[in-house]
């Protein structure tokens, strides 16, 4: 790797029903499994669970009769867990969860009362909004919350505009792949690393998870369809945020930059005993960015435009620690006939 890299900002595309054109993550309940029925390979069925939930399964082979999905892994593959759609005439128990889907809205609500019937989900004394459905959690712009399903996530996205960057944050898996329909672009990145400093650690330390990764060389075709896949073999695949957008170069990232975290945890002392209330933390990054002579006004305009705006930054594709979603902090752009170095602070969101 060289000593410098382009410093880019990415303006994330707004994700809508029209943009997310298909997904392997189930969202609504399906036909219930019946022990007396015979299923073909690819058939989808559900098994009811607690709190108005349903586990969704896919049949792995034909002539599939009387094999209970929950304990027949050679016959059924679990796709995920969903919750029943809210119905005003249904009586819900305390802690039951319902799904409410509207135009570009995919939300879950938890019942706050027993015998909960006929109360709209907008009644905050009866219902608590708990967030997006599992399929749409990766688009809620909250890095800590994850879409989680067994083995694999596949999202098909039709941007309808020029995009050249796909960024995955807080991802858990063995690999991530991005493919584009028009250009034939397809790239897979391994998400497990073994960064060690000596032979002892090489043999005895576990592989570590790469949690943040970007694909910054996607050919920008307006009519291209993107397929984003996270694979994790026989374990859960998870993704905190998926951002797709078009990057813009501000300048050149100079080395070295520094990164740390802002911790939101608190400590409490009771009778001399200190306990921690663990909360989320977020990246805090500081960069020196070389601005080409003559480009200062444009760099200033761009940084002003995206101040107090949520963006993705890519200071380098080689260091995951620099990849972040959040907002610009303090920055300044000096002017010089020979080019100058801008100081840019970035604060990530959780």
Task: Specify the residue positions occupied by each region the protein language model found.
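Extracellular/virion structural assembly segments
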Residues: 1-24, 131-152, 156-350
């Amino acid at each position: 790797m060289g000593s410098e890299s382009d410093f880019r900002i990415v303006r994330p595309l707004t994700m809508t029903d029209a943009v997310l054109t298909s997904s392997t993550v189930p969202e609504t309940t399906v036909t219930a499994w019946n022990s007396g029925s015979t299923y073909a390979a690819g058939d989808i069925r559900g098994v009811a669970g607690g709190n108005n939930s349903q586990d969704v399964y896919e049949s792995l082979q034909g002539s599939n009769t009387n094999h209970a999905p929950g304990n027949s892994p050679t016959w059924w593959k679990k796709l995920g867990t969903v919750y029943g759609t809210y119905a005003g005439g249904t009586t819900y128990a305390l802690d039951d969860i319902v799904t409410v889907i509207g135009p570009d809205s995919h939300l879950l609500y938890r019942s706050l009362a027993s015998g909960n019937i006929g109360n709209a989900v907008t009644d905050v004394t009866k219902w608590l909004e708990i967030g997006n459905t599992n399929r749409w959690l990766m688009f809620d712009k909250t890095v800590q919350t994850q879409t989680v399903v067994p083995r694999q996530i596949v999202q098909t996205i039709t941007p309808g505009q020029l995009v050249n960057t796909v960024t995955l944050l807080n991802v858990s898996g063995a690999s991530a792949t991005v493919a584009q329909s028009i250009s034939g672009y397809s790239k897979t990145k391994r998400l497990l690393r073994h960064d060690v400093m000596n032979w002892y650690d090489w043999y005895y330390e576990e592989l570590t998870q790469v949690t943040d990764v970007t694909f910054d060389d996607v050919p920008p075709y307006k009519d291209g369809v993107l397929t984003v896949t996270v694979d994790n073999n026989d374990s859960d695949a998870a993704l905190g945020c998926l951002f797709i957008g078009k990057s813009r170069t501000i300048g050149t990232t100079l080395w070295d930059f520094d990164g740390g975290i802002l911790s939101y945890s608190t400590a409490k002392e009771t009778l001399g005993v200190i306990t921690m209330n663990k909360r989320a933390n977020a990246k805090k990054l500081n960069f020196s960015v070389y601005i080409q002579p003559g480009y200062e006004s444009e760099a200033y305009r761009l940084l002003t435009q995206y101040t107090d705006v949520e963006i993705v930054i890519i200071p380098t594709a080689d260091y995951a620690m620099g990849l972040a979603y959040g907002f610009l902090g303090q920055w300044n752009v000096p002017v010089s006939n020979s080019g100058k170095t801008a100081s840019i602070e970035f604060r990530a969101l959780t």
